[in-house]
Amino acid sequence: MDFSIKGCDWSKGEAKGFLTGKSDCIVLGIFEAQTLSGAALDIDTATKGLISRVVKAGDMDGKRGKTLFLHEVSGIGASRVLLVGLGKQDAFNQKAYTDAVTAAWRALLSTKIVQVTFTLAQLPVDERSSDWGVRAAILALRNETYRFTQMKSKPEPASHTLKRVVFSVDPVDEKAAKLAVKQAVALANGMDLTRDLGNLPGNVCTPTYLGNTAKKIAKDWGLKAEVLGLKQIQALNMGSFLSVARASVEPPQFIVLHYQGAAAKAAPVVLVGKGITFDTGGISLKPGEAMDEMKYDMCGAGSVLGTMRAVAEMGLKINVVAIVPTCENMPGGNATKPGDIVTSMKGLTIEVLNTDAEGRLILCDALTYAERFKPAAVIDVATLTGACVIALGTHNSGLFSKDDALAGELLDASREANDPAWRMPLDDEYQDQLKSNFADIANIGGRPAGAVTAACFLSRFTDSYPWAHLDIAGTAWKGGAAKGATGRPVPLLAQFLIDRAGQ
């Protein structure tokens, strides 16, 4: 799909090109109080009051998400006009904008429209500029057009015909909007990769498959990939990671992916992604109901790989290292048992009270490995705890960090990217729940504050650098009729790196 930018100040009569240029459709916003947006006012004048008449007749009440096509419109180059309800003007925020553009795309994709002129990006949204609106609109469109068909013997072809979108933006934002197009497309491509990896079944998306995916990203985008096998992992004394992997016939992999966009001496940001390609719970076996969704337990790994692809396509001037410990968590005759004690790469001994709390066991060795890069910051991403889903539901990812500056950066990025996160507590008092009578630390801390104690466990391995943890158990995938991976938190991570790179 082709996206282009055209500057236009509708209030200064600069709309001639939009009014006379050929297009299948022009998209206009209408607020609930029957208020026309700047673009709608110009189109209304050009069509001799058609828009006003339609609104006054009650055919378009402006309620959020409502759409109405006007056909064979005279006075403008577009053959159709799509009116989109924006809701109340004083409540028009990021969510309202996203709802409006999503409704617009759904209406457009249900037609045979090929080219559309899109004016909604110029709407005032929480003091955001129109380049923000462009990026959010492209991501919403790519979200609507994403389909996972790789495993279908006869995949259905795309039903829409949309091929070209022209965004009208404020002239002062034209340069930034062109950059926003590039970043949005790269980000959408990274999210699609993340979704594809999550949606693949566990018999396809194995640890080896993830390793090969990392190698392909490196080959396609000029990165450096290292994929360590069992013997190399053993040589690194990653006893905690290996305690999870040991019962599976699928060999574990330890993936390290390097992107260098800045000077070699510049400290990198390290992203660590949990890569459990299927999680049965091990000996602490999960219930059978919905266990198929445990193929999504590698979505942390998928989001890190998707972010690396997006960063490379954007060409960000920053150094980034991705680390992905990946294996299956299976029961078996040689599986780790509840009560076993294992030794981590750091040397801390861990009493494994529950083998279904395995994500932290593979991440802790990866966090120790990250020390060698002398990182500027480390962010781990994991579908870590059901407790986080209970606490936050499926809207916000859980953010844990003792570093206020780093947490602030990530929260700012989450708001800018429209990829919400909520900061959770990480007080020292919670650490007491991880005490063990027999080892340095237990891998669980009981039912109370389960998401917090999981983060506390990880914090024991992050003394030498600024660190944050994102628990995406509630946001990485959806169940029900819309079942599938979401691609989150790639937007948050990418925006954080864009901000760090100053781009």
Curated annotation (Swiss-Prot):
Classify the main location. Answer: cytoplasm
Q: How is the cofactor bound?
A: Binds 2 manganese ions per subunit.
GO annotation (BP), single:
proteolysis
| InterPro entries named in the record | Leucine_aapep/pepB (IPR011356), Macro_dom-like (IPR043472), Peptidase_M17_C (IPR000819), Peptidase_M17_leu_NH2_pept (IPR023042), Peptidase_M17_N (IPR008283)
Entry's Gene Ontology molecular function annotations: manganese ion binding; metalloaminopeptidase activity
User: Which compartments does it reside in?
Assistant: Cytoplasm
Q: Which domain of life is it from?
A: Bacteria
Which Pfam families does this entry report, sorted A to Z?
Peptidase_M17, Peptidase_M17_N
Q: What is this protein called?
A: Probable cytosol aminopeptidase
Q: Give binding positions for Mn(2+) 1.
A: D279, D356, E358
Q: What family does this chain come from, according to its entry?
A: Belongs to the peptidase M17 family.
